[in-house]
């Protein structure tokens, strides 16, 4: 769970549009589908999930 310099642009993308940050980190997986759903249901849950995915992987 180390933060690298490549995570910084992913975090910026995650703040603007959370699915983009997840897509940059994991590609087109179930994480992206979950994040799109969370972003549609509420913007803040999408951001939280995106930050979790970026930090965890």
Curated annotation (Swiss-Prot):
Superkingdom: Eukaryota
Gene Ontology cellular-component terms listed: membrane
UniProt-listed InterPro entries: PMP3 (IPR000612)
Transmembrane feature ranges: 3-23, 36-56
Keyword RNA-binding: no
Transmembrane is among the record's keywords: yes
Main location: membrane
Pfam families in the cross-refs: Pmp3 (PF01679)
Keyword annotations: Membrane, Transmembrane, Transmembrane helix
Membrane topology category: Multi-pass membrane protein
PROSITE patterns: UPF0057
Record localization: Membrane
Family (UniProt): Belongs to the UPF0057 (PMP3) family.
Name of the molecule in the record: UPF0057 membrane protein T23F2.5
Organism whose genome encodes this protein: Caenorhabditis elegans
